[in-house]
From Swiss-Prot:
This is ATP synthase subunit c, chloroplastic. It comes from Pleurastrum terricola (Filamentous green alga). The keyword Translocase does not apply. Belongs to the ATPase C chain family. In plastids the F-type ATPase is also known as CF(1)CF(0). Gene3D superfamilies: F1F0 ATP synthase subunit C. GO terms for molecular function: lipid binding; proton-transporting ATP synthase activity, rotational mechanism. GO terms for cellular component: chloroplast thylakoid membrane; proton-transporting ATP synthase complex; proton-transporting two-sector ATPase complex, proton-transporting domain. The gene is atpH. Pfam families: ATP-synt_C. F(1)F(0) ATP synthase produces ATP from ADP in the presence of a proton or sodium gradient. F-type ATPases consist of two structural domains, F(1) containing the extramembraneous catalytic core and F(0) containing the membrane proton channel, linked together by a central stalk and a peripheral stalk. During catalysis, ATP synthesis in the catalytic domain of F(1) is coupled via a rotary mechanism of the central stalk subunits to proton translocation.
Length: 82
């Protein structure tokens, strides 16, 4: 295995996980803030807001999991290694 390919794969795996976590992290923080604001304005709609919030958290977190899958593929099933 070429050491340059191995080193680049490790760096790319770290970047994949790190960059894949930035967007969902910001999105989850923003969504949680607006959910708290919405519950404060309409306490009777708490159940609907919480359900929509948890569903959106699941979709946002799936993006981070995709980044993790790409990182694991680069580390353990690297297509660039012959």
């Amino acid at each position: 295995m070429n050491p340059l390919v191995a080193a680049t794969s490790v760096i790319a795996a770290g970047l994949a996980v790190g960059l894949a976590a930035i967007g969902p992290g910001i999105g989850q923080g923003t969504a949680a803030g607006y959910a708290v604001e919405g519950i404060a304005r309409q306490p009777e709609a708490e159940g609907k807001i919480r359900g929509a919030l948890l569903l959106s958290f699941a979709f946002m977190e799936s993006l981070t999991i995709y980044g993790l899958v790409v990182a694991l593929a680069l580390l353990f099933a690297n297509p660039f290694v012959s």
